[in-house]
């Protein structure tokens, strides 16, 4: 059967509209979890204020030089802040991926679904999803740090891994390997969707500072919710595409 991107886009749009409230609630809940965890594990305001003490920002040619000019205590604070942001983001993304994919599965099975039921049903697979998203993020970030293009390629090739992990109950590395093979064979259908997702995420990041005007906490929740909705659309598309490819 011939699969066209237009038909998958149409199916994705219809599902997103029909389940918008549930997907919005999952996105909002995941955003709230991300912000709360980030706040809990982040250094205090007093500690963050120490990062500016005695660090010659104007004389630093880059981030590496800036970190080198910090005291050991400041470097530890920066590491804690970075780890808190990364950890909270990974937790939020894992819950989002599990929740959205379970929504699709439950709706496809003709069952009624709520945000809490979808997240609860995804609980058994969250540890594997967390590891998968961590490894995927690590590979993509390393690729982007090198020449950007390898990172984008990795993001495309690993896009189907979360769907395959949940739908086919694969292991973490098995889903990554299978995703690379299947995506490469269907690159024309996967690449445009992932590139659009990356572009939308980048544009949201550029305007993220404007959300802080609402108060930092509310702005962070709102920005994360919008980011989660963008990711949810991609997950719906990838799930639908994967089911069509398997037929």
UniProtKB/Swiss-Prot annotation:
Please provide the record's keywords in A-Z order: Cell inner membrane, Cell membrane, Membrane, Transmembrane, Transmembrane helix
Do the record's keywords include Cell inner membrane? yes
- Any keyword Disulfide bond? no
State the annotated membrane topology for this chain.
Multi-pass membrane protein
Kindly give the Pfam families that the UniProt entry links to this protein. UPF0259
* Places the protein is found: Cell inner membrane
Main localization (coarse): membrane
Q: Which InterPro entries does the record cross-reference, listed alphabetically?
A: UPF0259 (IPR009627)
Q: Where are the transmembrane segments?
A: 20-40, 87-107, 116-138, 152-172, 185-207, 225-245
A Gene Ontology cellular-component term:
plasma membrane
Instruction: Give the protein family.
Output: Belongs to the UPF0259 family.
NCBIfam families the record matches: PRK02868.1 (NF002774)
**Name of this protein:** UPF0259 membrane protein YciC
């Amino acid at each position: 059967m011939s699969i066209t991107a237009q038909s998958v886009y149409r199916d994705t749009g219809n599902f997103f509209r029909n389940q918008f409230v549930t997907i919005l609630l999952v996105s909002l809940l995941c955003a709230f979890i991300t912000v709360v965890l980030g706040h809990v594990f982040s250094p205090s305001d007093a500690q963050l204020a120490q990062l500016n003490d005695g660090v010659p920002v104007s004389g630093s040619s880059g981030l590496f030089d800036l970190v080198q000019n910090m005291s050991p205590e400041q470097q530890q604070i920066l590491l804690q802040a970075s780890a808190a942001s990364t950890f909270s983001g990974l937790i939020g993304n894992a819950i989002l991926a599990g929740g959205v994919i379970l929504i699709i599965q439950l709706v496809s099975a003709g069952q009624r679904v709520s945000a809490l039921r979808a997240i609860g049903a995804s609980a058994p697979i969250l540890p594997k999803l967390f590891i998968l998203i961590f490894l995927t993020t690590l590979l993509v970030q390393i690729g982007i740090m090198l020449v950007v293009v390898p990172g984008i390629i990795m993001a495309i090739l690993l896009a189907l891994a979360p769907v395959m992990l949940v739908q086919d109950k694969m292991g973490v590395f098995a889903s990554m390997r299978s995703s690379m093979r299947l995506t490469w064979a269907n690159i024309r259908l996967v690449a445009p969707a992932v590139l659009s997702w990356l572009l939308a995420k980048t544009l949201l990041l550029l305007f993220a500072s404007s959300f802080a005007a609402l108060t930092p906490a509310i702005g962070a929740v709102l920005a994360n919710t919008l980011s989660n909705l963008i990711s949810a659309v991609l997950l719906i598309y990838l799930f639908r595409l994967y089911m069509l490819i398997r037929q």
